[in-house]
Amino acid sequence: MKLFDVYPLYDINIVKGQGCKVWDENGTEYLDLYGGHAVISIGHAHPHYVEMISNQVATLGFYSNSVINKLQQQVAERLGKISGYEDYSLFLINSGAEANENALKLASFYNGRTKVISFSKAFHGRTSLAVEATNNPTIIAPINNNGHVTYLPLNDIEAMKQELAKGDVCAVIIEGIQGVGGIKIPTTEFMQELRKVCTETGTILILDEIQSGYGRSGKFFAHQYNHIKPDIITVAKGIGNGFPMAGVLISPMFKPVYGQLGTTFGGNHLACSAALAVMDVIEQDNLVENAKAVGDYLLEELKKFPQIKEVRGRGLMIGLEFEEPIKELRSRLIYDEHVFTGASGTNVLRLLPPLCLSMEEADEFLARFKRVL
């Protein structure tokens, strides 16, 4: 059997990681400014993370959600405190797409509606309704194209008001900062108006913080810059630092019903140990504050490069838009300067490093970046 060939791959085999660096099988060191799609939050192979997962797998890796798992309760309590959402409830699953599927399902159970509002260039996952809410027709199969979703321009207040005024929208789902869409930031005016109109029309507001959350923006959640509280928040990626895990943070307005939501692997003992280790390190090493400080520095320095059309972002979630396609630039960064970066579309270079990126590593990236321009 061979692998189903759906990933365009760089010819590099990464075998080791430490902090913000990774090494290939030949021993070549790379600076990781991408964190595997924003997944690596506290750094590769953090000693505390390794210790907690190792101890847990030696004791109990998994048992089902038919018995008490006190680690889940610890994750919920800690996440409530660290995020400022102590009065919300937590449902644990394995991936971002699952988080958004369950969020949308919960919203529809709540108000009985079936219509969803998403936004231009949004990305919410690759399954069922999550992919239908993703504004990319090339990955929406006919079986997923069921007419539930209307896409609106981001930050267009009037278009949003007109659509919600119809009174038939189940949920609005929006990213705290658009990631795949090119590091596009919703304005505070738009987000506050969206919160107001959702409340007035009985529409559930879902904040997809899968890429922009967990401290990446310089606040725990990117929407906290906008001073709003959504009804549901979805998290994944950074929650487990590479261990598959995700969560749905649910407002007290929703009442749980036995059997309404469910999962086999979600919230397993290993995943919870990973999540607890991540929160330990985020707090002990002040990684949210570090993301803001180092991110602000990078944003300021990158704006000095005349070759870049526009620099966007918050914290360590940064997009560099160029006039021309960035494919060759990205290749030179990887093969010549040994720096991993990401892309959004054809013209935006995406930076999503671990939140422990130091000022010295930021300077090293800037020096290498300058050499390839």
What does each model-found stretch correspond to?
Residues 1-373:
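Conserved N-terminal phosphate-binding loop of PLP-dependent enzymes in the Aspartate aminotransferase
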